[in-house]
Amino acid sequence: MKYLIIILTSILIFSCKNGETQNEIGVPIVKSVSKGIVKRDFPLKGISKVELVSYYDRILWDTLKHKGERPFQKELVDNFKLTFDSTMIQERVILNKKQEKELLNLMVCDTCVSHEMSAACYNPRHMILFRDNKNRIIGYDEFCISCIGSRSSTNLDGFQKYCYSDMSALFKKFGIKYFVEDSKDEQEEYLFLKSKGYINY
């Protein structure tokens, strides 16, 4: 009987530990993937090319109004073209088919745990552009990784359920290098844009 209790206790402890990962001091590590992943169909059809771009905080330098809307609120693509100065784009990465599949797999799965909450700020520096076989932009997803917020084309509206930390990791994996990860980086970006005349305050 004594051996039976020891065996049952061991099985119970092992099965409980199997369900979560712990760090060195035994505190559970929260993963970005939830237990119940909901997978959806991607709404854009006819995608020929997927492009990742990065730029300095668009809110600091984008002064172009579009249809009377201020840069913060305007549509970022109209008539299949960007409505902001595309010369400010610092990096462009065209995804291969394998990378496209990995990106779309992240986008179609509602994987983010509820504790990743958006902040009041919005300092976008990254965007996904979806193009058709005529190289026209048919959809976009712009986001601010540090503020946990995004702006999307209407055909992707409400589709963002992935964790920004996961998307950030994917951008880095695919070759995007421009990230502002702390206040020092932010200050350097601001001073650089000011020195180039993009900021007047």
Language-model-derived ranges and their functions:
Residues 5-10:
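Hydrophobic alpha-helical targeting segments used for export or membrane insertion
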